[in-house]
């Protein structure tokens, strides 16, 4: 446990502090951590990672008991600084929402110990696709049947970090000087939160029950008809032929009944579609569940990173077939041209916040393999410029070209025209602003929203001048299959009570 003496020194200097303790946890998994600590609570989250469809990331994180929650609705933001005790105690904030968020990020800074990863404290949640309207002048938004906040970020007062390499869990409790508490009182409260979590970790996970293999989900209902989506693709091609854009990414949203516990969907998804960015957020009135393959923007050690993905083939049944499919993908002129467009867009996005002369691709047109598919991937980095920060870096890449198009602003205007509803979470970013000033967000792809016993899945595809409308429609259907399959199998992971 962090000593009071070291805590007090920083506290008296006006610096936010953390209290943390470690526990051997070589028998625990990310799921058991969630089940023990937070699975029956609202305003909780879980983050984990699998690279290449098979290699688990070192750290998995569970967060809970936020001391504050920030939300954005259109041109207004609000905050609940009593979130642990009253979930409804939101107060409006004066000023532009992005400036209130920037101030909150600054308020939440902590100089973290070197033996803790950046993800151990900070602000966690999502910035939806429509947050770009606070930056770019875009036409009026479409109808919003889900009615969710455009962005939600929570600041957990307890974070548990599972280190899969060392087989231990670290429980972290931040303490904020803005609380006005004495050093002794602040330390005592943080230490109590740590000890409560450690006691929960000592107990066995709740008993589970198999609901059977029968799918307990309804039929998918789209906000497009089949012909309506193909007509949208044709309209997009008209804009391309007219020279307005090079590419645009229309999408469709499906809804289906889903009466199983939300965390069961996440557990099913992590099994059927392990991905580099896996997340479960329970915001009380709704949940966001995803397995995204793609970075939106990352800021680490003052280096900004984007990693465009475009170009896909299924995995082969044998190593020989896999190599043949890779060769086919890398010789497909349409796929290569689309990827090059997005690589150039990534350079431009990084260049908006990077020092002149530092933007460069570190990987170009490489193949990255996942459990079911392979993609063409490039990596672009740049050193962040003086005067820029984690929020400006994120906004420079929001939304990614892979969910909007190129040129980006005109493509978004066309998306507003083609799509019948506001996008919401889809196409935005999910991740965190770390307490040490770093940031990591993925694109909200392969992401589901659960609200009022309804599951919403959205997917799109890049339309270029020679796109086939039927093929584009089928691409969106195929991209939704991972979540559809996870929903069908979720009954295998449902528990008797308290799940989600």
UniProtKB/Swiss-Prot annotation:
Signal peptide residue numbers: none
Binding-site list for Mg(2+): 338, 475
Designated gene of the protein: trpE
UniProt keyword annotations, A-Z: Amino-acid biosynthesis, Aromatic amino acid biosynthesis, Lyase, Magnesium, Metal-binding, Tryptophan biosynthesis
Gene3D superfamilies: Anthranilate synthase
Pathway noted in the entry: Amino-acid biosynthesis; L-tryptophan biosynthesis; L-tryptophan from chorismate: step 1/5
Cofactor(s) this protein requires: Mg(2+)
Catalysed reactions, semicolon-separated: chorismate + L-glutamine = anthranilate + pyruvate + L-glutamate + H(+)
Keyword flag Acyltransferase: no
Subunit (UniProt): Heterotetramer consisting of two non-identical subunits: a beta subunit (TrpG) and a large alpha subunit (TrpE).
GO molecular function, one term: anthranilate synthase activity
Cofactor note: Binds 1 Mg(2+) ion per subunit.
Entry-linked NCBIfam families: trpE_most
Chain sites annotated for binding L-tryptophan: 49, 276-278
Annotated protein name in UniProt: Anthranilate synthase component 1
């Amino acid at each position: 446990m962090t000593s009071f003496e070291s805590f007090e020194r920083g506290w008296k200097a006006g610096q936010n502090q953390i209290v943390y303790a470690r526990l051997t946890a070589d028998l625990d998994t990310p799921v058991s951590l969630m089940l023990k600590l937070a699975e029956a609570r609202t305003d909780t989250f879980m983050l984990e990672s699998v690279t290449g469809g098979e290699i688990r990331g070192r750290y998995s994180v569970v967060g809970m008991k936020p001391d504050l929650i920030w939300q954005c609705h259109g041109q207004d933001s609000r905050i609940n600084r009593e979130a642990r005790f009253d979930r409804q105690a939101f107060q409006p904030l004066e000023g532009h929402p992005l400036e209130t968020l920037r101030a909150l990020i600054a308020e939440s800074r902590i100089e973290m110990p070197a033996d803790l990863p950046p993800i151990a404290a900070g602000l966690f949640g999502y910035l939806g696709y429509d947050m770009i309207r606070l930056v770019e002048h875009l036409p009026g938004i479409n109808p919003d049947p889900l009615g969710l906040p455009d962005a939600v970020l929570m600041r957990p007062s307890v974070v548990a970090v599972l280190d899969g390499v060392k087989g231990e869990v670290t429980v972290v409790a931040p303490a904020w000087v803005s609380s006005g508490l004495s050093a002794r009182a602040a330390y005592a409260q943080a230490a109590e939160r740590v000890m409560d979590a450690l006691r929960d970790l000592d107990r066995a996970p709740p008993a589970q029950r198999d609901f059977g293999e029968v799918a307990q989900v309804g039929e998918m209902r789209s906000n497009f008809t089949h012909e309506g989506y193909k007509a949208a693709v044709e309209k997009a091609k008209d804009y391309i032929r007219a020279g307005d854009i090079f590419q645009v990414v229309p999408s469709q949203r499906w809804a289906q009944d889903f009466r199983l516990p939300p965390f069961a969907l996440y557990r099913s998804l992590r099994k059927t579609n392990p991905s580099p960015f896996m997340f479960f957020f329970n915001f009380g009135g709704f949940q966001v569940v995803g397995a995204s393959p793609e970075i939106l923007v990352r800021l680490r050690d003052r280096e900004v990173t984007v990693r465009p993905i475009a170009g896909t083939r299924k995995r082969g049944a044998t190593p020989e077939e896999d190599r043949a499919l890779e060769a086919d993908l890398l010789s497909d002129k349409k796929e290569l041209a689309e990827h090059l467009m997005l690589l150039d867009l990534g350079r431009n996005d990084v260049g908006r916040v990077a020092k002149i002369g530092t933007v460069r691709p570190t990987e170009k047109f490489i193949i990255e393999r996942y459990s079911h598919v392979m993609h063409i991937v490039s990596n672009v980095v740049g050193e962040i410029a003086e005067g820029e920060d984690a929020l400006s870096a994120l906004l420079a890449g929001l939304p990614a070209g892979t969910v909007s198009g190129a040129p980006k602003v005109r493509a978004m205007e066309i998306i507003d025209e083609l799509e019948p509803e506001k996008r919401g979470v889809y196409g935005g970013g999910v991740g965190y602003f770390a307490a040490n000033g770093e940031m990591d967000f993925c694109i909200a792809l392969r992401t589901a929203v659960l609200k009022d016993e309804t599951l919403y899945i959205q997917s799109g595809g890049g339309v270029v001048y020679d796109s086939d409308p039927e093929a584009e429609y089928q691409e969106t259907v195929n991209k939704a299959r991972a979540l559809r399959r996870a929903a069908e199998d979720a009954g295998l992971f449902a528990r008797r009570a308290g799940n989600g």
